[in-house]
């Protein structure tokens, strides 16, 4: 799996913005990606040192549209903690 295929998108929410102050960054990642692959992808793509990585599988929610019920897709969320003093520039401009 390529490094660009592992990290799909950054997660920009109020909670993830607060975590940034602690040196933690949140990404939407590929469903089959492992913690080791995620750490390596962040290290290679952003040239930072990763100290910790936690992963959560987010279940899809049931939604209704008029008379039909549907379900949003499930996805995988990774929270990556960087070494002290390290930052990812792409988040600082957001």
Curated annotation (Swiss-Prot):
Part of the 50S ribosomal subunit. Contacts protein L29, and trigger factor when it is bound to the ribosome. The gene is rplW. One of the early assembly proteins it binds 23S rRNA. One of the proteins that surrounds the polypeptide exit tunnel on the outside of the ribosome. Forms the main docking site for trigger factor binding to the ribosome. HAMAP family: Ribosomal_uL23_B. Coiled coil: none annotated. One of its GO terms (biological process) is translation. One of its GO terms (molecular function) is rRNA binding. One of its GO terms (cellular component) is ribonucleoprotein complex. InterPro entries: Nucleotide-bd_a/b_plait_sf, Ribosomal_uL23-like, Ribosomal_uL23/eL15/eS24_sf, Ribosomal_uL23_CS. It comes from the Bacteria. The keyword Nucleotide-binding does not apply. This is Large ribosomal subunit protein uL23. Belongs to the universal ribosomal protein uL23 family. Keywords: Ribonucleoprotein, Ribosomal protein, RNA-binding, rRNA-binding. The keyword Ribosomal protein applies.
């Amino acid at each position: 799996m390529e490094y660009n295929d592992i990290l799909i998108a950054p997660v920009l929410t109020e909670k993830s913005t607060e975590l940034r102050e602690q040196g933690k960054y949140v990404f939407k990642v590929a469903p089959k990606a492992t913690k080791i692959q995620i750490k390596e992808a962040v290290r290679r793509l952003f040239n930072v040192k990763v100290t910790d990585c936690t992963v959560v599988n987010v279940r899809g929610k049931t939604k209704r549209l008029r008379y039909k019920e549907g379900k949003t897709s499930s996805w995988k969320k990774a929270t990556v903690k960087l070494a002290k003093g390290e930052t990812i520039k792409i988040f600082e401009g957001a």
